[in-house]
C-alpha cells in the first residue's frame, strides 16, 4: 500500500497540499504488488520506532536518513504515516492532517540538531553507521564530519558527495551546489 499510494495520489510531491484539479494519475487503478523479498540467510529486522528507542539494539549497520531542514516529515507525509502505523487518528483541516504535537523532530531545528546527532552516533550499538544528509542541512558539513570523527575508529570516517538535482515542480533550478552526502564510519 505504501508503494502504491504515490502513483495515484493527487499531489505534487507532499501530502500537505493537494492539486486543485484532478491529475490524470489520480484516475489510475491502484495496483498492490507483493514486494520481492530476497533472503540473505540472516536474521534481519526492520523497526518502526523513534531512533532513540532503538539505539541500544545491536546491529551491523545503522542507516539514518534524518530530516535536514526545518520542514517536518509528518505533516508532509501524514497519509503515509497513517498507513504505516495502521491507526485511526483524529484528523483535522482540509487535508485531513493528523495531530503530531509532541512528535516534532529535533533534527528539524537548528538549535537542537547537533544534540539529536550526538546520541545517534554516541549511543548506538552497531559496527558501522551510514548517514544520508545534504550540504545545505541545519548542521554544517564540518560540524557533522567532526561529530562522526569523534565516534569513528581511526581512519574509518569517509564523506561521499554526489550532485543532487533540487526538486522544484519539474522546473529546472539554476541554483547549483546541492550535494547529497553519505557519511560512513566504523564505530569505536
Kindly label every feature range from the protein language model.
Residues 1-77, 85-103:
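SAM-dependent nucleic-acid methyltransferase catalytic core
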Residues 70, 137, 166:
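Feature marks short, surface-exposed loop/turn motifs that line or immediately flank catalytic pockets
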Residues 76-79, 144-146:
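Short, glycine/charged-enriched secondary-structure capping and boundary segments
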Residues 106-152, 161-162:
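Conserved Class I SAM-dependent methyltransferase catalytic core
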Residues 141-148, 152-188:
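Class I S-adenosyl-L-methionine
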Amino acid at each position: 500500500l505504501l508503494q502504491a499510494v504515490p502513483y495515484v495520489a493527487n499531489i505534487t510531491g507532499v501530502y500537505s497540499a493537494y492539486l486543485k484539479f484532478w491529475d490524470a494519475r489520480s484516475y489510475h487503478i491502484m495496483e498492490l504488488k507483493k514486494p520481492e523479498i530476497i533472503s540473505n540467510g540472516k536474521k534481519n529486522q526492520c523497526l518502526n520506532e523513534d531512533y532513540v528507542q532503538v539505539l541500544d539494539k545491536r546491529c551491523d549497520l545503522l542507516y539514518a536518513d534524518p530530516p535536514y531542514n526545518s520542514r517536518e516529515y509528518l505533516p508532509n507525509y501524514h497519509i503515509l504515516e497513517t498507513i504505516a502505523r495502521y491507526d485511526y487518528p483524529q484528523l483535522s483541516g482540509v487535508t485531513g492532517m493528523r495531530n503530531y504535537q509532541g512528535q516534532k523532530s529535533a533534527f528539524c531545528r537548528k538549535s537542537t540538531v547537533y544534540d539529536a546527532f550526538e546520541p545517534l552516533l554516541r549511543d548506538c550499538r552497531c559496527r558501522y553507521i551510514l548517514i544520508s544528509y545534504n550540504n545545505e542541512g541545519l548542521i554544517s558539513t564540518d560540524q557533522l564530519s567532526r561529530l562522526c570523527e569523534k565516534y569513528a575508529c581511526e581512519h574509518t570516517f569517509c564523506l561521499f558527495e554526489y550532485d543532487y538535482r533540487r526538486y522544484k515542480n519539474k522546473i529546472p533550478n539554476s541554483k547549483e551546489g546541492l550535494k547529497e552526502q553519505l557519511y560512513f564510519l566504523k564505530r569505536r
